[in-house]
Swiss-Prot record:
GO MF terms, alphabetically ordered: GTP binding; GTPase activity
Region described as Switch-I: 40-48
Binding site for GTP: 21-28, 71, 125-128, 153-155
Quaternary structure annotation from Swiss-Prot or TrEMBL: Found in a nuclear export complex with RanGTP, exportin and pre-miRNA.
CDD domains: Ran
InterPro entries tied to this protein: P-loop_NTPase, Ran_GTPase, Small_GTP-bd, Small_GTPase
Cellular-component GO terms for this entry: cytoplasm; nucleus
Pfam families found in the cross-reference section: Ras
Source species: Solanum lycopersicum
Residue span, Small GTPase Ran-type domain: 10-174
Coiled-coil ranges (or none): none
Protein name per Swiss-Prot or TrEMBL: GTP-binding nuclear protein Ran2
């Protein structure tokens, strides 16, 4: 079924909704994909931009129709029309702003109220920034809800493809699916300290073996 502003294409396509607090970098993230930015359409009835993001896999081309809120979330929650027919989702927070992580459960609840049993990726953005407020080991929500989590840096393109690859594998039911070529991305605006980030990733792995805190606030003590 073609959704508004979604032309029928002869390869698999999926509605991807991106949610999270304002200022977490959702729009910056989506705009990295240059062809999607060039071909985006505005959906005035809901007030979103729909970006068609194409990826090329070993099983052929797939498209994510990526719905971007255009900042409405700053005025409260999003209308159900944003979520309806969503087939996969990304919840984004900013690792330099603790409140954006504390609001992740609310976004998850709103999403799951309308879209049941869809694959969801949690993304901690802005890992290129030095003064992290949310450390890798403090990110536990994905473990409680069985979500995938990736640390990303939209402005440096770090881990850009990983959320899409995870979702593509889940939607295709094929854990061996892989991308055979990279999409054209905007050039990096910042550089990321890969050595420092490798330590964060190690911390993340080590945290998987730790018991979950009863309350997320405990993780910040």
């Amino acid at each position: 079924m073609a959704l508004p502003n979604q032309q029928t294409v002869d390869y698999p396509s999926f509605k991807l909704v991106i949610v999270g607090d304002g200022g977490t970098g959702k729009t910056t993230f989506v705009k990295r994909h240059l062809t999607g930015e060039f071909e985006k359409k505005y959906e005035p009835t809901i007030g979103v931009e729909v970006h068609p993001l194409d990826f090329f896999t070993n099983c052929g081309k797939i498209r994510f129709y990526c719905w971007d809120t255009a900042g409405q979330e700053k005025f409260g929650g999003l209308r159900d029309g944003y979520y309806i027919h969503g087939q996969c989702a990304i919840i984004m927070f900013d690792v330099t702003a603790r409140l954006t992580y504390k609001n992740v459960p609310t976004w998850h609840r709103d999403l799951c109220r309308v879209c049941e049993n869809i694959p969801i990726v949690l993304c901690g953005n802005k890992v290129d920034v030095k003064n992290r407020q949310v450390k890798a080991k403090q990110v536990t929500f994905h473990r409680k809800k069985n979500l995938q989590y990736y640390e990303i840096s939209a402005k440096s393109n770090y881990n850009f493809e990983k959320p899409f690859l995870y979702l593509a594998r889940k939607l295709a039911g094929d854990g061996n699916l892989h991308f055979v070529e990279s999409p054209a991305l905007a050039p990096p605006e910042v550089q990321i300290d890969l050595a420092a980030q490798a330590l964060h990733e190690q911390e993340l792995q080590a945290a998987l073996n730790q018991p979950l805190p009863d309350d997320d606030d405990e993780a910040f003590e």
